[in-house]
């Protein structure tokens, strides 16, 4: 029905699609500016409870803003700098939106707020509110009205803090997005021209990609009133929109060319292309959307943003490929064909490769499997961790320079203290609930933990080896509030850089004489990380189940989907391997200019897994559809494999090349995890389209033979009722294709009925 509609009214469909595209561009521009600056925070976690208690009981919180004051001529103890530091602290304290502030120049401030050489010192502040308020409103105003006012020839003032770091990261991601647009679009057009050898199909394919990218951003605008969408979703919409638009358009145009080569006129060829290849595109889109939809499992807006973006991209790519593109095919006619005419698939490279593989499946398949295992071996050393300023590459970013100074010159990082809160606990002299001695012993115990520089509490300030508890640096009133008390556990810079998550666990594991909750910036990052890692098994299970169902509906087999899932997981191990080897261990640091931290941020790796797995299944759908089509036509379980691969592998290779190039553009990003995403995804797509589809798939299908298309009786009946049925490419006239032999007909009927 859709094909007939497009054939009858191609101009109407094309004009409507063009107007939708132009409207999408206009709406997309407003979407990008409205996206959110999400934090790495886990709602409902212990750190969230601590943050709420600090706000409610103490009117303070973990410092999320820091100002580094550097003296140009003397030290921070010089009279002029002391006076300026006091004025700066007062200005920050009084600034609209700031809830609390203190500094090295505050009364009884600890020495850790100054550098070892006394040339730098810190002002810390807590700004309540969500990330958009803090990063979008308070910080820009603080930079313009306070930092720039106090910055002078005598002292240099730099703005930092956790929210400032990721404000800069988000801004850099936006700049990378714009640069990627300028590079990806002409690059894709050139590659498409090399694939098609004609400008018309290249422009049509790029138009579908732009339709998917712009349309997805426009759809996200409809979601924004109901949920937060991360700024990084725009990057995903661009690269996946272009990639899926190219994938689906290549598949449709290749099928159109085959239909014309089989003797059908161009009008009939369009209808048969939509009726046949269009359904495969739909199933492929369902697979990719399902792989990304599992991100809704996570209660983190940063991750659910990519689920919304992925679903929107798939919807727009499928619509563009099955509605707008057929209208172009109908109007362009023979201008969409190869200038030299179609070649025989049997003469192609992939036919020869797959035939060679199937002659010796154990040898070739074993060699391919060994290569995957070797490339994926570094995955065994994967270590999850939390991001910090080092996600910004070395360069001209002041916030990165600021924290390099803090790491090298400061013994501890007060802004990253762990905050231990005991709500509804009266502590102190004369208390009947918790004696002051219990608080004294608990604070002293925390100070003995490896990597703890100092513990501040109402009972005093404790350092390792000092259990006497001298007077607290800010006075007892900062650590007591009515029926509550709190402690500040200050980590050393070395421990914070090496193992912040381990420190959080040790603090939480220390026996306390009263109920406590542990918060602070390191605890928030640890809870976010744990929230992701704990749900990884569920996400993996959901992805496997959903993709199995989609492939079963397409093939009617239980063996082929299982084989595909195993091979896809093996290909993804290569992606994980290069991330660990290149980014966690730093092998690519010199080439790309980032700073390795020895850990991988889990949410980005999870996003990569979902995208790569969905795209792998995308290619698997194309491949299996053509192999099964050949099997249904000939009944030959062996020859159908190279024949199907010969017809699908060229377009899969071309699509993978273009998609890999689009992802690889992000290797030039100034944000480390965008580089990780670009390099890892480019490699995953390249390996999947070559080693997996060209070697391991034909080897596996040769070894499983006719069992590849087997399923139990009840499932066969279910597939007969609801499964995908794609007609083969048949000549327009002449005798029907050779019927399968009698001994294979029952099996074929089960798979093609």
Give the positions of each predicted feature.
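Disorder-to-helix initiation segments
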Residues: 36-40, 47, 239
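Structured non-transmembrane domains adjacent to transmembrane bundles in polytopic membrane proteins
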Residues: 44-64, 72-163, 384-590, 599, ...
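Short hinge/gating elements
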Residues: 34-38, 387-389
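Membrane-embedded transmembrane helical bundles of large multi-pass transporters/channels
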Residues: 1-34, 98, 129-384, 513, ...
